[in-house]
């Protein structure tokens, strides 16, 4: 029996299989999974080491693949005698270059902007770009000296900063993109100029943020093999179906002839949405018909993969004397590097969000993604919104100070609600929890502000304390674009439930969350499920793991598919909707009123999927396109939050220590509070790094010695406050949390820095040298003695 429901379109096919094994201590009773702090379904495997990551498997006889990369910021190149190189190096089996790509030597995450070659053809546009791949036995490939490879480089003038890229007469990074502008973003509402003319208080500022490396624990890795006229790739990824489409185009074959099998992922944060090892593996496996394996070193990973966009932002805000916001004018340029990657998404998402979660009746936000000869900037937890929050939340503090308002109360006064339109004109109607988040911080805010003032008033040494706050909002899913998820559920003759869901769990817990949702919709215990996740040959397409969409979108599709399966069982039993189901080793028992009926499954015929009943549902969040002024409904659901940071500053050294973070987040419904708290704590850690230490300099910091990330000693206690303002269309009211958790941390810390010592660091991160320089500059302006 097959049951399908599409809302509104699309199904395909994806998986890693494992049986859910629970215990009385770890698994909730039937019907009580949602809201339960059950342990992750893959938790034991991660702890005992049995989980399979990208580098953990090597097929028998697999050859090693190694990329030859451009060592310069920009260079032309020519090859010597590659055939002779292979002959002269026993153990090397082949060298592949652009001419060996069977299909299109171009890929990209957004089709119309695709511009990145598998192998550069004549010119390498950035340091670390691949020009060739060497394939051979592992020992020989690993021992190969790059200087022995026959390639001659001709260094070319290069562009690294936005001003140089935009300068008249600047070299074009891509001939078809005048002025090196990849794309522009725009949201305009009301009359900004008139509003500023009547605003009683105005503040303006400029902020700059740098490159940030993802620094996940697992560098990119995987293997591939050709199976007849198909190719299979097992690798770490956030987007198996996107990978499949790109690899098919690169090989010049139909997508159905490419199978992507995601491994467990040791962190992604957006970078593993882009291809890494996959094209090299695919080309080598296709030509050689042998298994091939590739594992990036940490240096290679940092050198060649995407980063958070550096941003240069200029903004101005105005309000009335009572603190009500009247206008915001925001302009930002993002350094998108040599190739497009997710630059268009960043440019589109930021103008929607740069107001923050506040009612701003007159608004203008203009963005540009600018090409340079740097490693591509791509997706990184928040798609540019964390950069915008750093600017807008500090400016709102300045406005609050100028009107003499408490900084938290200023935000509460201006917070969006269910009836006020956003800057795109969208009225959300329900599920707007920003005011509740801000109000949840109020007791701690008042107490901490008093403690900091008391400390500073009696401090005789260089230490000062400060408290800062910042709000956030974030749309779940793609911006005004379709982003459906399809989930299939099958009931076996023995009463076990097989969940086919293609959402890749990159550490956030989607395998567990989606299973909890299905369990409660069916009234089944977690132990009755077998989970298949993230394999393009086995599970339907659940879209990419990004944009805080999996709990909301895939979770909703799973809820719908579970509802269909339940109806199918009730139809078999001939009972009404009010009946309840009991799943156990005997099959399924239907309870209605005072009677019970065992549904016999063993005699039922199997459908095309091998189940007695199969249900499938697709959910695509309802959005609308934005018009030329960015007006419309870009997201169906938004997550909201607010963070408060307490810090200590050493005014002699310029060092900042975060003492505590209190984080309030509107999650709609907390499907698994423990997993949500984990996301919040991880977001705080990344936000702290962005605020105080993380900055990547190409060619200078391609290792984790020179590139600083927070260590355990840097992470403060984090108090998480979960607010539940349900979304009418989320599964059990749930929203996303993955990206929301990182956005307000950095601005809260930077606002606390100003609260402590009265300075603003306009270029982030606020490293000790920058903090110290700002202190000295402030003393100079105020006529104090330097020291």
Each language-model region and where it sits:
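Flexible, low-hydrophobicity surface segments
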Residues: 2-182, 202, 287
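C-terminal catalytic domains of large/alpha subunits in multi-subunit enzymes
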Residues: 2-8, 98-101, 252-257, 287-292, ...
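Glycine-rich loop/linker segments at domain edges
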Residues: 36, 42-48, 179-222, 228, ...
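Short, aliphatic-rich beta-strand segments
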Residues: 65, 231-235, 496-501, 658-660
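Short acidic, glycine/serine/threonine-rich loops at helix termini
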Residues: 106-110, 144-148, 244-246, 269-275, ...
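Conserved catalytic cysteine-centered active-site region
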Residues: 123, 254-256, 260-262, 285-297, ...
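Helix-loop-helix junctions that connect adjacent transmembrane helices in secondary transporters/permeases
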Residues: 170-251, 415-496, 703-721
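Thiamine diphosphate
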Residues: 264-289, 293-294, 510-517
């Amino acid at each position: 029996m097959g049951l399908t429901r599409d809302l509104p379109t699309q199904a395909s096919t994806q998986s890693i299989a494992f049986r859910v094994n629970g215990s009385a201590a770890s698994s909730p009773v039937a019907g009580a999974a949602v809201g339960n702090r059950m342990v992750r379904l893959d938790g034991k495997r991660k702890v005992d080491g049995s989980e399979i990551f990208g580098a953990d498997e090597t097929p028998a006889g697999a050859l090693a693949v190694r990329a030859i990369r451009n060592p310069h910021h920009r260079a032309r190149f020519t090859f010597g005698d590659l055939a002779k190189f292979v002959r002269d190096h026993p153990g090397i089996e082949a060298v592949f270059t652009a001419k060996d790509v069977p299909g299109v030597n171009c890929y990209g995450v957004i089709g119309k902007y695709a511009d990145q070659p598998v192998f550069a053809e004549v010119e390498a546009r950035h340091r670390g770009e691949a020009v060739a791949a060497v394939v051979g036995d592992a020992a020989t490939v690993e021992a190969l000296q790059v200087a022995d490879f026959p390639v001659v480089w001709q260094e070319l003038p290069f562009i690294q900063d936005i001003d140089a890229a935009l300068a008249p007469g600047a070299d074009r990074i891509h001939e078809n993109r005048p002025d090196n502008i990849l794309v522009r973003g725009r949201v305009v509402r009301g009359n900004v100029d008139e509003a500023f003319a009547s605003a009683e208080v105005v503040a303006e500022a400029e902020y700059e943020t740098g490159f940030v490396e993802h620094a996940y624990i697992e560098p990119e890795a995987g293997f591939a093999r050709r199976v007849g006229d198909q190719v299979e790739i097992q690798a770490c990824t956030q987007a198996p179906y996107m990978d499949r489409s790109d690899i098919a185009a690169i090989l010049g074959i139909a997508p159905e002839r490419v199978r992507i099998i995601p491994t467990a992922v040791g962190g992604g944060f957006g970078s593993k949405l882009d291809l890494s090892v996959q094209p090299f593996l695919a080309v080598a496996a296709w030509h050689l018909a042998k298994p091939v394996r590739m594992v990036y070193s940490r240096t290679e990973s940092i050198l060649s993969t995407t980063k958070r966009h550096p941003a240069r932002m200029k903004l101005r805000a105005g309000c009335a004397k009572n603190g009500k916001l009247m206008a915001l004018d925001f302009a930002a340029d993002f350094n998108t590097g040599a190739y497009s990657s997710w630059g268009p998404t960043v440019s589109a998402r930021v103008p929607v969000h740069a107001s923050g979660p506040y009612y701003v009746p007159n608004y203008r936000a203009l963005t540009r993604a600018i090409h340079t000869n740097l490693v591509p900037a791509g997706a990184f937890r928040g798609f540019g919104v964390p950069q915008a929050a750093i600017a807008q939340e500090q400016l709102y503090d300045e406005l609050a100070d100028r009107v003499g308002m408490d900084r938290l109360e200023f935000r509460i006064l201006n917070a969006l609600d269910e009836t006020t339109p956003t800057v795109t004109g969208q009225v959300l109607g329900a599920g707007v929890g920003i005011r509740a988040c801000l109000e949840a911080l109020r007791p701690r805010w008042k107490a901490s502000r008093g403690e900091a003032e008391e400390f500073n008033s009696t401090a005789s040494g260089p230490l000062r304390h400060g408290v800062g706050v910042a709000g956030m909002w974030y749309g779940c899913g793609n911006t005004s674009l379709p982003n459906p998820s399809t989930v299939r559920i099958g009931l076996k003759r023995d009463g076990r439930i097989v969940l086919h869901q293609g959402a890749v769990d990159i550490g956030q817990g989607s395998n567990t969350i989606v299973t909890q949702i299905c369990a409660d919709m069916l009234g089944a215990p977690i132990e009755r499920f077998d989970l298949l996740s993230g394999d393009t040959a086995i599970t339907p397409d659940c879209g990419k793991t990004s944009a805080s969409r999996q709990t909301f979108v895939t979770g909703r599709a799973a809820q719908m598919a579970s509802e269909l399966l339940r109806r199918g069982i009730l139809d078999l039993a001939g009972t009404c909707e009010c009946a309840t189901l009991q799943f156990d080793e005997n099959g399924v028992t239907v309870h209605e009123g005072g009677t019970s009926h065992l549904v016999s499954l063993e005699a039922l015929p199997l459908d095309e999927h091998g189940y007695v009943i199969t249900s499938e549902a697709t959910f695509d969040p309802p959005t609308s396109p934005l018009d030329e002024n960015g007006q419309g409904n870009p997201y169906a659901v938004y997550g909201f939050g607010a963070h408060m940071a307490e810090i200590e500053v050493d005014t002699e050294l310029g060092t900042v220590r975060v003492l505590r973070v209190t984080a309030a987040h509107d999650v709609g419904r907390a499907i698994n509070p423990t997993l949500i708290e984990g996301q919040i704590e991880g977001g705080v850690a990344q936000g702290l790094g962005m605020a105080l230490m993380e900055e990547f300099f190409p060619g200078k910091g391609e290792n984790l010695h020179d590139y600083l990330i927070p260590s355990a000693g840097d992470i403060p206690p984090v108090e998480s406050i979960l607010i539940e303002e349900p979304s009418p269309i989320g599964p059990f009211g749930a929203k996303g949390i993955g990206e929301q958790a990182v956005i307000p941390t950095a601005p809260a810390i930077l606002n606390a820095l100003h609260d402590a010592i009265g300075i603003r660091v306009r270029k982030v991160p606020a490293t000790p040298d920058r903090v110290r320089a700002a202190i000295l500059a402030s003393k100079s302006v105020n006529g104090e003695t330097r020291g």
